[in-house]
């Protein structure tokens, strides 16, 4: 039995060779690690952390990843709004820093798993392992979690939602 995040961590430790530049030794940044990185990026970009609060920036990045938006797609979606463009700047730098450090955050466990499950050969291999999927608190799932479950369930779509 897995949570979405624990499944993602296990899956990615086995499949990271299919997602360069990562390898299976990646650390997983918790909320505090992510916030520290965002604070450092705000300093690098000369952005005031009172105007661009790290918690708010972190929530926007998390939301983007939950919608499976990579930094460039996020930037394209937000348009010309000044604040949103600065969030996009931080997101791009944040993503770059994670990759440089072979690190993932909690949202990446869902984001990257869903991306890799979109590759047919990988998806088929994992679909053979799971014949039924039970999702507790289904109403709390985000887009990435929904898509992950749908991809794993495959053609049988044996998903039980509680």
Q: What are the functions of these language-model segments?
A:
Residues 126, 137, 144-148:
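Helical "lid/switch" subdomain of P-loop NTPase nucleotide-binding domains
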Residues 134-141, 162:
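Hydrophobic residues in beta-strands of the RecA-like P-loop NTPase core, especially within AAA+ ATPase
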Residues 1-132, 156-159:
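A basic/glycine-biased coupling hinge at the interface between accessory DNA-binding modules
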Residues 9, 142-143:
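Conserved protein kinase catalytic core
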Residues 143-162:
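Conserved RecA-like helicase ATPase core segment
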């Amino acid at each position: 039995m897995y949570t979405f995040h624990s499944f993602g961590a296990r899956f990615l430790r086995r499949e990271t060779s299919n997602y360069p530049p990562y390898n299976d030794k990646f650390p997983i940044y918790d909320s505090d690690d992510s916030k520290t990185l965002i604070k450092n990026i705000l300093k690098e970009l000369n952005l005031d952390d009172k105007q661009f609060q790290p918690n708010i920036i972190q929530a926007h990045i998390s939301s983007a990843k939950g919608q499976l938006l990579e930094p460039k797609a996020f930037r394209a979606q937000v348009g010309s709004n000044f604040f949103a463009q600065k969030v996009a700047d931080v997101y791009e730098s944040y993503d770059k820093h994670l990759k440089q450090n072979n690190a993932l955050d909690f949202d990446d466990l869902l984001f990257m798993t869903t991306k890799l499950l979109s590759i047919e050969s990988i998806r088929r291999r994992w679909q053979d392992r799971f014949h039924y999927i039970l999702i507790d608190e289904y109403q709390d799932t985000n887009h990435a979690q929904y898509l992950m479950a749908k991809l794993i369930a495959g053609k049988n779509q044996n998903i039980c939602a509680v």
